[in-house]
């Protein structure tokens, strides 16, 4: 004797179930941004860009100069979790090194 499962809809023989297509959205992206200050050495900023954002020395120097001249510079664009992790890593490293360097994330 067949047992009937609770909460399982019964269907007639020959019924075809159609699968609904789900529209997947790409994840929201966030810019990781370094903010200028008058105390953090430029060389430290270049090192941060190389170590945490995998920038070559030339690119890191260009971003550092943008931070210096314009007040802020974009290090990279990432998903929310990765951006938040990079902000925390950079902020912790700067704090441990005794520098007031600020790193924030902004919606891209």
From Swiss-Prot:
GO terms for biological process: protein catabolic process; proteolysis. It comes from the Bacteria. Belongs to the ClpS family. Involved in the modulation of the specificity of the ClpAP-mediated ATP-dependent protein degradation. Binds to the N-terminal domain of the chaperone ClpA. This is ATP-dependent Clp protease adapter protein ClpS.
């Amino acid at each position: 004797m067949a047992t009937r499962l609770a909460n399982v809809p019964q269907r007639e023989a020959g019924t075809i179930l159609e699968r609904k297509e789900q529209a997947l959205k790409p994840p929201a992206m966030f810019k990781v941004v370094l903010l200028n200050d008058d105390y953090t050495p430029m060389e430290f900023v270049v090192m941060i860009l190389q170590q945490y954002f995998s920038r070559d020395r030339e690119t890191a120097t260009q971003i550092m100069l943008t931070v210096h001249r314009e007040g802020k510079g974009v290090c990279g664009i990432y998903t929310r979790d990765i951006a938040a992790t990079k902000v925390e890593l950079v902020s912790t490293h700067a704090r441990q090194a005794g520098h007031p360097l600020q790193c924030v994330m902004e919606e891209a």
